[in-house]
Amino acid sequence: MQVAVPAQTTVELCSTEAQAILSQENCIAIFGSNQVAAEGVLAANANLNVLGSDAANGDVIGVGFDAGSIIKAAVQDGTFLGAVTQSPLMMAYYAIYALTAAANGQELEDVPTDGYWYDSTNMDDEEIAPNLYD
């Protein structure tokens, strides 16, 4: 396992780090841990063309986190196996809940924020589609 963190979070710098990882002969998978990092992985792949969803055929499996249009397109076309998306509706709900509780002097606790795995087979599902924002 190798972890790479660029000095700044830009698609270009994430792409440089991802290219270094994807160029290694023994690379079997890569994860972009946020929208910028995932888009960096995809930008790196534009030069290398190693990502896909068929590990048995030698593809490097790519997975991302978030749901911007670039990541969704990569999931739809099979460049990424899938990605994890957040629930913006529930994040906003819990933010308002916490703000109201704080304004009323109540003690705050950690709140859950759900994440959902999506791939090309479930992007239109009732539970997933509302969370695939741009």
Q: Where does each model-flagged region fall?
A:
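Hinge/cleft segment of the Venus flytrap/periplasmic-binding protein
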Residues: 87-134
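Short, glycine/charged-enriched secondary-structure capping and boundary segments
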Residues: 44-47, 76-78, 98, 132-133
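Short, structured loop/turn "capping" segments at alpha-beta junctions
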Residues: 1-2, 27
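Hydrophobic alpha-helical
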Residues: 7-73
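Short beta-strand elements at the ligand-binding edges of bilobed clamshell
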Residues: 77-89
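Short beta-strand-to-loop elements that line the ligand-binding cleft
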Residues: 2-6, 63, 85
